Amino acid sequence: MDTIAAISTPMGEGAIAIVRLSGPEAVKIADKMYKGPKGKTLSSAESHTIHYGHIADSTTGRIIEEVMVSVLRAPRTFTREDVIEINCHGGIVTVNQVLQLALREGARLAEPGEFTKRAFLNGRIDLSQAEAVMDLIRAKTDRAMNVAMNQMEGRLSALVRRLRDELLETLAHVEVNIDYPEYDDVEEMTHQLLVEKASGVKKEIEALLRTSEQGKILREGLSTVIIGRPNVGKSSLLNSLVHETKAIVTDIPGTTRDVIEEYVNVRGVPLRLVDTAGIRETEDIVERIGVERSRQVLKEADLILLVLNHSEELSEEDVKLFEAVEGMDVIVIMNKTDLEAKIDAERVKELAKGRPVVTTSLLKEEGIQDLEEAIQSLFYTGAIESGDLTYVSNTRHISILHQAKQAIDDALNGIEQDVPIDMVQIDLTRCWELLGEIIGDAVHESLIDQLFSQFCLGK
């Protein structure tokens, strides 16, 4: 492989910026740029050491940056290649000049995610662990971070490998029974034994799939839409949850003319919180566009926060909103409890049909804790805190597990219908192959390229 280089820290002003190199020529290329005290070179440095010095243009001798350089030699590195990390002062100009020097001296600009891709290709991590790196970077809550860390440390991989080993052992027994039925010292693979083996694998796959809903919520966040008539307090609710002003809050109906989105962490539940323009008919063309977008977002939501005005009677528009969210996960919020109550609370509970109803005065910052508790109780059962739980959150993994379960079901149905054992073997082999796709065994190169292209440069 050639040697790659990239800036591994976010662009912009900061205390430190890092230029990373990986590959067989990493140390040699860095040495061409490095000027150490008393003529010290990086080539003579031991692995996993850090060295003070300067980066200089090898053609002009001009000093570009004062640096600390880490030397990490293969195979005890993230990529299992020689790795150099040049710690520069944070900024844009100097760190870019250091990168350009590395490219001029023989390195190639890394593609997005190429460092992690090399870690995968060199056997340092498997595909599910590589995907967990991105999950860790994108984690919005402590629980999401813990999920990613467990996967990155190989908990899911270990379970998948164990299931594959069990399937492979079963397949080997089937093969021996087919090819050498006369051998007395080989355990006979009866239909009953085959059912036991296949059912055991199915049970574990189903257990993983039961964790997928909460896992996906932690990974991607709940698409949460705030709806209500104009001026009932939707934008105030958004700002209360986000703890900063994101939307215009006035007494004028219709001041939110578009969809406003923000990530918030509500007691460990990540919400992609969306404030919508009031869903009503309007003559204002700009506001009408916002209303149309609101309706589309509503259809795609995981959770609805339906806001009502506690100081006004229920209107026909309010009732229509209840009808629009029929069958969806909804929390009803009666806002403006600081004003005289005019709403029919019993009628609201009737329309809510058993779904949570909370009261708030967002102006006085009252009732937010009750709302957060309602959100937590809807989507968090406590299972995520279990340190022993292994589960899936990645959409690709979930899809593969569903296919693997179907393959096991097909095998069990075949056994029940007394089909030839070699036909059952095909379905079990299919399940074994599918599970291998989770950890990166026998996956197409285009899929690998597509997965790593989602990473940032330098990772």
UniProtKB/Swiss-Prot annotation:
(6S)-5-formyl-5,6,7,8-tetrahydrofolate binds at residues 20, 85, 124, 459. It comes from the Bacteria. GO terms for molecular function: GTP binding; GTPase activity; metal ion binding. Residues 221-380 form the TrmE-type G domain. InterPro entries: G_TrmE, GTP-bd, GTP-bd_TrmE_N, GTPase_MnmE, MnmE_dom2, MnmE_helical, P-loop_NTPase, Small_GTP-bd. Pfam families: MMR_HSR1, MnmE_helical, TrmE_N. Binds 1 potassium ion per subunit. GO terms for biological process: tRNA methylation; tRNA wobble uridine modification. PROSITE patterns: G_TRME. Its EC number is 3.6.-.-. Mg(2+) binds at residues 235, 256. It is found in: Cytoplasm. Its cofactor is K(+). GO terms for cellular component: cytosol. K(+) binds at residues 231, 250, 252, 255. Exhibits a very high intrinsic GTPase hydrolysis rate. Involved in the addition of a carboxymethylaminomethyl (cmnm) group at the wobble position (U34) of certain tRNAs, forming tRNA-cmnm(5)s(2)U34. Homodimer. Heterotetramer of two MnmE and two MnmG subunits. Belongs to the TRAFAC class TrmE-Era-EngA-EngB-Septin-like GTPase superfamily. TrmE GTPase family. HAMAP family: GTPase_MnmE. This is tRNA modification GTPase MnmE.
